[in-house]
């Protein structure tokens, strides 16, 4: 047969290869994210990384439109049923990328609330390592999936409805402890668990150096608010000053008097305590001097705006099922705090209007922050697909007392592109108007406070990074500031200034992410690509200084990890020269945009009095006309030496919250410029070697320094016995840490007070009477992060 030349416009190939070529180069990822990794995943969609080069730039809003599910972040047991449901709703063929250490294996979160790898409930094609992986790593994961599709799949027979062939994910779901190791490092010698693995604590887990002298916790200066003798007189001597307290004025009070004492403090004619800061519980059952403590202690932290400072009311409880009166009749913000205490400790509050679990699933057994509850997921039965099918969320109708026939109930979340994370809003509608709402939280609860009870004091710093995962070292600062106050550590001036500079850079970065995504929430698509470009410029500086991006874990108790690198000042100057012009561009895009303004003006209003009543802090409080900023009012970390203004706006609406954050970027730029200009010389970490690793030259000349190096390197430093609460002005509001030391190298209790928790609790006040479309603008204007909310 005579050979004929094939025309140049004809390509011969196998049908399998043609189908795989089309599928690999047009992946349709679902708009789905779980935690920190999702932010880096979304960064890969912006201009610096440009995932559109790989044909995967269009995020699909529903699982039925998508063929790629990226598990970007931690897999929580409360969220696992929804993950499985979303996966099963995707059409075939479908693929899964597990992004980040938490999704791959649980990562650093071997804790009761976290599934130890998403491959225990759904199959996975590609695992991307990192915590979080950089955008480049995610892009490599996409390329590996494309290569897998091209090389391994034979879809033609499936497409033609014939027997045989393969397409989509074919790997099995694994069972923890059966088809996968419960410890990713494998067994130790002769099958013995490795010392200090997720399976077994190291033999020397607790302190071996009680005989080492350390100074007692220092007594800090704090106001008495004119209370001398007042409570003792009014309550007949049943309320007394706690003389051992060193961080704030503290009173001991019997449980039955708590609401009356709180009501008196709130209603004082002079210097009233307008805000309930937090309700903190401590299980005292494992104290080393057990006879000195009750079974439980409940601490009420109050804030005074007139005489800036905090006050603590402390009450003691006994028994397996302790109970005290609810404070919700005095402070409405006590609602969620008391529910959390019930959920985590089993403490009941008589008279609470709706005492049920808030963070854990409704069918959870036990109370996780009690000392007898397991620390780790690997101490509990493996989580399986059957568990994910069995454990389901409460029906929406259970969140309301009465539902009329004309009422429509809708679920917004826990997976929705407009919710800024995994959270479930239950809306009660009359037409499209919101007449009531409730919030189901805890889908991002990863047991940070429980983890704090098993890490030594410095080991916990990386976990703080992942609370507000957009705020970076701001999280470190809140934690180390509280520990330093407990220990009486003096931080060198250079370290203080370095901390301020990096904290303000992260404030700008956090506000930029908020500004871009908030604009997108109300229909403006351009700003998000601009703001992420500027965020990358900040991250270039952060990476130069710390070596990390989102989670530097760079602050240390007593200072910072190391000195600033050569060239840091030039990089900072370049950014300071660049950013003001960009800020003007954002305002040109948004401030005078009639649609943007119409979507925000007068929407989601909360008054100044309501904001104080419900514990609103940060930009959201200042948007109500309240000039309250902890950097000015209760200064910390040297902020009293910097010059800046406290921006305020009137109105308390979405527009005011937008204007505040834009102006705060300007003020932060001003602070960073002062840090660059006035950076002092000297040490970058304290020379109090009881608490830090000494410099090598000091260990060679001073035996005490060498001893402290050995102790701190082997088991970590141990603060004096005591407790301390202090807070900082984080980007989203006030972030505080209440740390309790029993004199050991691990904390006895770590309480994390975050701004997102009270802000989301107050959401019904801002939402009733508005439309569903307005609701998305309202929740966007608040600026919350799910890890900050659920911890």
Swiss-Prot record:
GO terms for cellular component: plasma membrane. It catalyses: a quinone + NADH + 5 H(+)(in) = a quinol + NAD(+) + 4 H(+)(out). It is a peripheral membrane protein. Keywords: Cell inner membrane, Cell membrane, Membrane, Multifunctional enzyme, NAD, Quinone, Translocase, Transport, Ubiquinone. Residues 411-791 are annotated as: NADH dehydrogenase I subunit D. It is found in: Cell inner membrane. Pfam families: Complex1_30kDa (PF00329), Complex1_49kDa (PF00346), Oxidored_q6 (PF01058). Its EC number is 7.1.1.-. PROSITE patterns: COMPLEX1_30K, COMPLEX1_49K. The keyword Cell inner membrane applies. Its main location: membrane. Residues 1-155 are annotated as: NADH dehydrogenase I subunit B. InterPro entries: NADH_DH_suC, NADH_Q_OxRdtase_suD, NADH_quin_OxRdtase_su_C/D-like, NADH_UbQ_OxRdtase-like_20kDa, NADH_UbQ_OxRdtase_30kDa_su, NADH_UbQ_OxRdtase_49kDa_CS, NADH_UbQ_OxRdtase_CS, NADH_UQ_OxRdtase_20Kd_su. Residues 229-384 are annotated as: NADH dehydrogenase I subunit C. GO terms for molecular function: 4 iron, 4 sulfur cluster binding; iron ion binding; NAD binding; NADH dehydrogenase (ubiquinone) activity; NADH:ubiquinone reductase (non-electrogenic) activity; quinone binding. It is an enzyme of class 7 (translocase). NDH-1 shuttles electrons from NADH, via FMN and iron-sulfur (Fe-S) centers, to quinones in the respiratory chain. The immediate electron acceptor for the enzyme in this species is believed to be ubiquinone. Couples the redox reaction to proton translocation (for every two electrons transferred, four hydrogen ions are translocated across the cytoplasmic membrane), and thus conserves the redox energy in a proton gradient. NDH-1 is composed of about 13 different subunits. Subunits NuoBCD, E, F, and G constitute the peripheral sector of the complex. In the N-terminal section; belongs to the complex I 20 kDa subunit family. This is NADH-quinone oxidoreductase subunit B/C/D. The gene is nuoBCD.
């Amino acid at each position: 047969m005579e050979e004929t030349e094939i025309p140049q416009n004809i390509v011969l190939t196998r049908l399998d290869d043609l189908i795989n070529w089309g599928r690999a180069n047009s992946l349709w990822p679902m708009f789905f994210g779980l935690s920190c990794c999702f932010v880096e995943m979304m960064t890969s969609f912006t201009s610096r990384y440009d995932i559109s080069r790989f044909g995967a730039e269009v995020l699909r809003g529903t699982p039925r439109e998508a063929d790629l599910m990226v598990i970007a972040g931690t897999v929580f047991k409360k969220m696992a049923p929804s993950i499985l449901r979303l996966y099963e709703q995707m059409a075939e063929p479908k693929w899964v990328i597990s992004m980040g250490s938490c999704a791959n294996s649980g990562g650093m979160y071997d804790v009761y609330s976290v599934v130890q790898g998403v491959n225990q409930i759904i199959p996975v094609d590609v695992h991307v390592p990192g915590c979080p992986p950089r955008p480049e790593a995610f892009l490599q994961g996409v390329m590996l999936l494309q290569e897998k599709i091209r090389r391994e799949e034979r879809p033609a027979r499936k497409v033609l409805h014939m027997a045989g062939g393969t397409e989509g994910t074919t790997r099995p779901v694994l069972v923890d402890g059966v088809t996968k190791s419960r410890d990713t490092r494998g067994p130790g010698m002769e099958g013995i668990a490795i010392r200090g693995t997720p399976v077994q604590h190291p033999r020397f887990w607790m302190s071996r150096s009680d005989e080492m002298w350390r100074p007692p916790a220092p007594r800090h200066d704090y106001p008495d608010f004119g209370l001398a003798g007042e409570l003792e007189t009014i309550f007949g001597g049943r309320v007394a000053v706690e003389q051992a307290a060193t961080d704030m004025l503290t009173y001991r009070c019997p449980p039955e008097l708590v609401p009356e004492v709180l009501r008196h403090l709130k209603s004082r004619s002079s210097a009233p305590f307008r805000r309930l800061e937090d309700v903190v519980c401590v299980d005292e059952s494992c104290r080393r001097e057990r006879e000195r403590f009750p079974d439980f202690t409940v601490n009420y932290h109050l804030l005074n705006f007139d005489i800036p400072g905090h006050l603590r009311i402390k009450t003691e409880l006994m028994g397996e099922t302790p109970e005290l009166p609810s404070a919700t009749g005095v402070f409405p913000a006590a609602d969620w705090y008391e529910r959390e205490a019930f959920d985590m400790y089993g403490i009941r509050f008589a008279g609470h209007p709706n005492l049920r679990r808030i963070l854990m699933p409704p069918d959870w057994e036990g109370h996780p922050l009690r000392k007898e509850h397991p620390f780790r997921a690997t101490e509990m039965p493996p989580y399986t697909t059957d568990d994910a099918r069995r454990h389901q969320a409460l029906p929406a109708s259970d969140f309301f007392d009465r539902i009329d026939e004309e009422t429509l109930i809708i679920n917004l979340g826990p997976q929705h592109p407009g919710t800024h994370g995994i959270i479930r809003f239950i809306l009660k509608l009359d037409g499209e108007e919101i007449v009531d709402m409730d919030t189901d939280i805890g889908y991002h609860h990863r047991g940070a406070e429980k983890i704090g009870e098993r890490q030594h004091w410095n080991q916990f710093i990386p976990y703080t990074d992942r609370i507000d995962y957009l705020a970076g070292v701001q999280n470190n600062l809140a934690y180390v500031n509280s520990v330093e106050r407990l220990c009486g550590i003096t931080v060198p001036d250079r370290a203080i200034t370095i901390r301020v500079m990096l904290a303000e850079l992260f404030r700008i970065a956090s506000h930029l992410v908020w500004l871009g995504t908030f604009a997108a929430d109300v229909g403006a698509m351009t700003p998000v690509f601009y703001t992420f470009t500027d965020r990358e410029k900040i991250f270039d500086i952060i990476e130069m200084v710390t070596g990390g991006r989102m989670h530097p874990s760079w602050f240390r108790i007593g200072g910072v990890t190391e000195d600033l690198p050569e060239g840091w000042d030039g990089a900072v100057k370049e950014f300071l020269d660049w950013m003001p012009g960009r800020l003007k561009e954002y305002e040109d895009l948004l401030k005078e945009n009639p649609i943007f303004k119409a979507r925000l003006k007068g929407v989601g209003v909360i008054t100044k009095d309501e904001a104080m009543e419900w514990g609103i802090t940060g930009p959201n409080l200042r948007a109500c006309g309240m000039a309250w900023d902890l950097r000015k009012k209760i200064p910390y970390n040297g902020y009293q030496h910097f010059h800046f203004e406290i921006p305020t706006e009137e109105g308390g609406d979405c527009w005011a919250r937008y204007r505040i954050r834009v102006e705060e970027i300007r003020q932060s730029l001003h602070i960073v410029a002062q840090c660059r200009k006035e950076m002092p010389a000297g040490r970058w970490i304290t020379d109090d070697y009881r608490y830090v690793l000494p410099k090598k030259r000091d260990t060679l000349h001073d035996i005490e320094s060498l001893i402290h190096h050995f102790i701190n390197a082997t088991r970590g430093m141990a603060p004096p016995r005591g407790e301390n609460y202090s807070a900082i002005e984080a980007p989203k509001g006030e972030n505080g840490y209440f740390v309790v030391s029993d004199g050991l190298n691990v904390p006895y209790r770590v309480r994390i007070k975050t701004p997102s928790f009270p802000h989301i609790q107050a959401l019904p006040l801002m939402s009733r009477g508005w439309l569903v479309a307005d609701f998305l603008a309202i929740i966007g204007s608040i600026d919350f992060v799910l890890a900050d909310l659920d911890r």
